[in-house]
Curated annotation (Swiss-Prot):
Keywords: Cell cycle, Cell division, Periplasm, Signal. It comes from Bordetella bronchiseptica (strain ATCC BAA-588 / NCTC 13252 / RB50) (Alcaligenes bronchisepticus). Belongs to the TolB family. This is Tol-Pal system protein TolB. It is found in: Periplasm. Part of the Tol-Pal system, which plays a role in outer membrane invagination during cell division and is important for maintaining outer membrane integrity. InterPro entries: 6-blade_b-propeller_TolB-like (IPR011042), PD40 (IPR011659), Tol-Pal_TolB (IPR014167), TolB_N (IPR007195). The gene is tolB.
Length: 441
């Protein structure tokens, strides 16, 4: 067997030996009902996209307080992408029925203008109507109405931002999607789910012992993860709406690194039940049925299905150092994908299957890299010293990862071309192992 370097040992089994290897003792986990989490967030953004679309977002009329808040969420969503340049729309006086003075807005530098109205109905629900104007072509690009409670208005704002993003760029927006991550506060670990902007965090699971490797089901209704509560790592599938969960990999040895098949029926996992860590497939519904995929003389871990469900990307040290490979579900010969550098781990593949994302060690630093699978061209997306756990947004345009800032682990994001970066700091804890959820509607 090839020698396993300390660095690869750190990364093996999705990082739990790196961080928690000394913590394999009798554990006690407290599973909680779906509940709000209290977190103070700070978002910092730097860089701009190669193309910036000039857009004005007017405050929504009639209900000034809610209309202003609605517009602020939309502006913040678009700003975080780095693809939009906001044009001042203060004092526009527009409502959803206004006639747009296209030439005037064009003179202000806005190629696009979003505006609308929000009113409270007799049933207490809010009616939101929005329009998107193209000031260059002097026409309406989009117009739609929403209805929701006061608590749902932020979600409505994200939906409007999604529509604006798609109408202007041609790419589906991700502002209405969710993210999951592990938050560590003191000696407590929380598996949290939040909106894509980090707001509205909810606790899915709280434990005094480590929770690692969260992975979204394709429909966004469940999370698979590894919990140590039984005295060893066990893979669970957790239904978010009910907090019900089942163990799906609880074999002898370590059970780790769950990844969903595209149809949501199976999970690829890394198991040591037969010796070294190898890749297996188990049912997402539980049970003892499983199928071994890899049989190598090295350590195989961190599996991920390709979008077509026909093969698996994984990390292995079979060539001497950790590199990324691809194999069919029949377990045939694996094909090596990464050749730059001696250390590449934590693979993720883009939703369209064209790009590989991974952690690359370069000049002693762990950085997020992307590989064009057609050309073989590698791009280093980040410049941190210890960047970990990359995850694609469901539209493939952004990448979520964990970074170290001022000695603390924070949530970070970068555009898929590396030009725009953002960090989201939780002021009373450390964020680990983020993963971006799928489109759900």
């Amino acid at each position: 067997m090839p020698a396993m370097t300390p660095a690869f040992r750190r990364a093996d089994l999705t990082g739990f030996l790196r961080t928690y290897g000394a913590a394999l003792i009798l554990l006690l986990a407290a599973m909680l009902a779906w509940q709000p989490a209290q977190a103070q967030l700070r978002v910092d953004i730097s860089g701009t996209g190669a193309t910036q679309y000039p857009v004005a977002i007017a405050d929504f009329a009639v209900d000034d307080t809610h209309g202003r808040a609605l517009a602020e969420v939309i502006r913040a969503d678009l700003t975080r992408t780095g693809q939009f340049r906001l044009i001042n729309a203060a004092g526009s006086g527009l409502n959803v029925d206004s006639q747009v003075a296209h030439d005037d807005w064009r003179a202000k530098g806005a190629d696009f203008l979003a505006y609308g109205s929000i009113t409270r109905g007799p049933d207490g629900r809010y009616d939101v109507r929005y329009r998107l104007a193209d000031t260059v072509k002097k026409g309406q690009l989009d117009g739609v109405a929403f209805s929701g409670t006061e608590q749902e208005l932020r979600r409505v704002a994200h939906q409007i931002a999604d529509r604006i993003y798609e109408k202007i760029t041609g790419v589906r927006g991700v502002f209405s999607t969710r993210i999951a991550y592990v938050l560590k506060r003191g000696s407590t670990y929380e598996l949290q789910v939040a909106d894509a902007d980090g707001q509205n965090p909810q606790v899915a699971l709280r434990s005094r012992e480590p929770i690692i490797s969260p992975s979204w089901s394709p429909d966004g209704s469940r999370l698979a993860y590894v919990s140590f509560e039984s005295g060893k790592p066990v893979v669970y599938v957790h239904t978010l709406a009910t907090s019900a969960r089942i163990p799906v990999a609880n074999f002898k040895g370590n059970n780790s690194a769950p990844a969903w098949s595209p149809d949501g029926s199976q999970l690829a996992v890394a198991l040591t039940r037969d010796g070294l860590s190898q890749i297996y497939i188990v049912s997402a519904g539980g049970g003892s049925n499983m199928r071994r995929i890899t049989r190598s003389p090295g350590i195989d871990t961190e599996p991920n299905f390709t979008p077509d469900g026909r093969s698996i990307i994984f990390t292995s040290d079979r060539s001497g150092g950790p590199q990324i490979y691809q194999t069919g579900l029949d377990g045939g010969d694996a094909r090596r994908l990464t050749f730059n550098g001696g250390y590449n781990i934590s693979p993720r593949i883009s939703p369209d299957g064209s790009t590989l994302l991974y952690v690359a060690r370069r000049d002693g630093a762990f950085r997020i890299a992307s590989l064009n699978l057609s050309s073989g061209s590698e791009t280093l997306l980040t410049d941190g010293r210890d960047d970990q756990s990359p995850s694609f947004a469901p539209n493939g345009m952004q990448v979520l990862y964990a970074a170290i800032q001022n000695g603390r682990s924070v949530l970070a994001g970068v555009s898929s071309d590396g030009r725009v970066r953002q960090t989201l700091s939780v002021l009373n804890g450390e964020i680990r192992e983020p993963t971006w959820g799928p489109f759900t509607r």
